[in-house]
A protein has these predicted regions:
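Charge-centric, low-complexity intrinsically disordered segments used as regulatory activation/interaction regions
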Residues: 1-11, 43, 137-158, 165, ...
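N-terminal domain-start signal
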Residues: 2-102
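Eukaryote-skewed repeat-based solenoidal scaffolds used as protein-protein interaction platforms
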Residues: 65-73, 77-208
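Terminal, non-catalytic domain-edge segments
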Residues: 1-27, 188-253
């Protein structure tokens, strides 16, 4: 597919979406795959997953990626990935709680263990979407939501923070301010700001340390409140030093 002139990160994302379509075109769920008609959907809907490349209606797509009990989640995920990824980028995926749920759907498929071409297509998409989000002044999905998804999908936070650290232009800093405002309550209570399947404490510790190191210099733009900077400073304190600081916001947990 050809694309009109676009910023490099947008072109990279378009190329990654095309790559998913190529890598997973023709894929279907396992012929013996099944699910509960009472709780998931009808036999006719299940049959759609066993036909390649036909578009699912949004509700069927949602029920498919959300279902935790497929016999072969990997084959189901491969069947829906091109459409699922496009819906994610457009912001049309609506989880019950947070977008980390969609990340866990990736994780349940163990995509990093797939054949190299398929795994690289997924990896390229996640990285391209993240870079595009950080450089877009008004992304369809907030950066803090995308970070939760890609972290859960990949079982690591490090590469995503590394990318954010290297992007120091205005949109990336604005997204950082928005994320800190969203996260500070949970992080000051020593809680990760999204539900995580594993390594929750390690992820929270890494995120907190990264914010303490990087956020202060990047949150001094006009419009960022001094109180938000104090919240970041408090993240670097522990115990009584944090709770008794004159700028402690009075959060109760």
């Amino acid at each position: 597919m050809t694309h009109p002139a676009q910023p490099p990160v947008r072109l990279r994302l378009a190329t990654a979406l095309d790559g998913l379509a190529v890598a997973f075109g023709g894929m279907t769920a396992h012929p013996d795959e099944h699910n509960c008609e009472c709780h998931w959907g009808s036999a006719e809907e299940l049959a759609q997953l066993k036909v390649p490349d036909t578009e699912l209606d949004p509700d069927l797509l949602r029920r498919t990626w959300q279902a935790p009990d497929w016999s072969d989640h990997a084959s189901v995920l491969r069947r829906i990935l091109p459409q699922f990824a496009t819906a994610l980028v457009k912001g049309s995926v609506e989880p019950l709680f947070g977008l980390e749920e969609a990340g866990r759907s990736f994780a349940r498929g163990h995509w990093q263990q797939w054949p190299t071409v398929q795994a690289e297509a997924v990896r390229d998409f996640l990285h391209a979407w993240w870079a595009d989000t950080l450089t877009d002044p008004d992304p369809a999905v907030p950066a803090y939501e995308v970070l939760a998804l890609v972290t859960e999908a990949s079982a690591t936070l490090t590469p995503w923070l590394t990318t954010w650290e290297t992007l120091t232009d205005h949109p990336a800093d604005d997204h950082l301010a928005e994320a800190v405002a969203k996260w500070e309550y949970d992080l000051l209570g020593d809680q990760l700001p999204w539900d995580s399947w594993e390594n929750e404490e390690e992820t929270r510790t890494e995120l907190t340390a990264w914010l303490v190191r990087n956020a202060p210099a990047r949150l001094r733009a006009p419009g960022v409140s001094g109180e938000l900077l104090h919240r970041v400073r408090l993240l670097g304190l522990t115990g009584d030093d944090r709770w008794e600081d004159p700028h402690w916001p009075g959060h109760r947990y």
